Regions:
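N-terminal short secondary-structure element
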Residues: 1-31, 36
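Beta-alpha-beta core module
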Residues: 155-166, 181, 228-277, 286
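Central regulatory/effector-binding core of bacterial HTH transcription factors
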Residues: 92-154, 217, 223-224
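Flexible hinge/capping segments at coil-to-helix
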Residues: 157-194
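Hydrophobic hinge/microswitch elements
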Residues: 130-143, 149, 200-259, 307-308, ...
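Short beta-strand-centered segments that line the small-molecule binding cleft or hinge
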Residues: 87, 110-114, 132-168, 172, ...
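A short LG(V/I)-centered, amphipathic sequence patch enriched
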Residues: 41-61
Length: 314
């Protein structure tokens, strides 16, 4: 039994039993993957996969039981490598971060800049995706830490910590009627075409809930996953925008105006997460604290010992 055999099984399950994709991910050949799986099955004494001819179609019952064990062995091996790197190369290595567009574009730059200055020999990888994709990248070992507002607390294998709270703003062109001195209300916002986030992104569900609670159905004419797109179409006059307040920069967004809407929509919480049981390098703890200063190493380590499924609050 060897790690490459175990990786072949894990990747086959992850990639829909497509051995071509597995071979590509493991930088080997498809026959090589098939051989690794067969040799492991022979050693174990049972089949891990249901087959249709030469194709894998699903896990067998025994395979479904074995897969979490295989994933645990591989996670342990990866942790062991990190331990070795921690003591052999304390200030060098790789840090992979998964984040939504809003976090990558607006929340992370200062932390990344400061971290790079302190750790020039650490290679940074930044992956962007939906909140669910961020969670999957953590679970699959593609990312060391993930940052998002939605979804992370829904995955029991993840340790989640609150980073910061934020609210939404309404953005409009200059001289828009909403810029008068009257109080901004949901009723007034609902009088105009709305451009905002796609469902599942950047607090969209809280925006919807706020309108529904008042019996309002806003005319959402366009949705997008990131604020830059929303701002572009507000500039074109398609409607007013509802975005995370952090996404508006008065110096850059000179053709727009922002109106604080913190009183209209519930507060959102952005969280940081990592896979439970993962050995974190010292520089990972430093990055986490650089991004969210209350999240010291002591706090993060305490969170990792909490009962699975609990969202750790600071």
């Amino acid at each position: 039994m060897n790690l490459q055999q175990l990786r072949s099984v894990r990747e086959a399950a992850r990639r829909g039993f497509n051995l071509t994709e597995v071979a590509r991910a493991l930088h080997t050949s498809q026959p090589g993957v098939s051989r690794q799986i067969r040799e492991l099955e022979q050693e174990l004494g049972f089949e891990l996969f249901v087959r249709a001819g030469k194709r894998l179609t699903s896990l067998t019952q025994a395979g479904a039981v074995a897969l979490p064990v295989i994933e645990g062995i591989l996670a342990g091996a990866e942790n062991l490598l990190r331990v070795g790197e921690e003591y052999a190369r304390q200030s060098a290595g790789k840090l992979s971060i998964a984040a939504t567009h809003s976090q990558a574009r607006y929340a992370l730059p200062d932390a990344v800049h400061d971290f790079r200055r302190r750790y020039p020999d650490v290679q940074l990888e930044l992956h962007q995706g939906s909140p669910q994709q961020v969670a999957e990248m953590l679970l699959n070992g593609e990312a060391d830490i993930g940052i998002a507002t939605e979804a992370l607390t829904e995955y029991e294998p993840l340790v989640t910590l609150s980073c910061y709270r934020w609210t939404h703003s309404v953005i409009v062109p200059p001289r828009h009627p909403l810029l008068d001195d009257e109080t901004l209300t949901l009723e007034r916002v609902a009088d105009y075409p709305v451009i905002t986030y796609s469902p599942g992104f950047s607090g969209r569900i809280r925006i919807d809930d706020a309108f529904h609670a008042r019996g309002l159905s806003p005319n959402v004419v366009l949705t997008a996953m990131d604020a830059d797109v929303i701002k572009t179409y507000v500039e074109l006059g398609l409607g007013i925008g509802i975005v995370a307040s952090i996404a508006f920069d008065e110096e850059r967004d000179t053709r727009l105006r922002a109106i604080d809407a913190g009183q209209l929509f519930p507060v959102n919480v952005t969280r940081l997460a990592f896979r439970r049981g993962t050995f974190l390098r010292s520089y990972v703890y430093d990055f986490i604290e650089t991004f969210a200063s209350p999240l010291t190493r002591e706090v993060v380590e305490q969170a990792a010992t909490q009962t699975p499924g609990i969202d750790f609050q600071i």
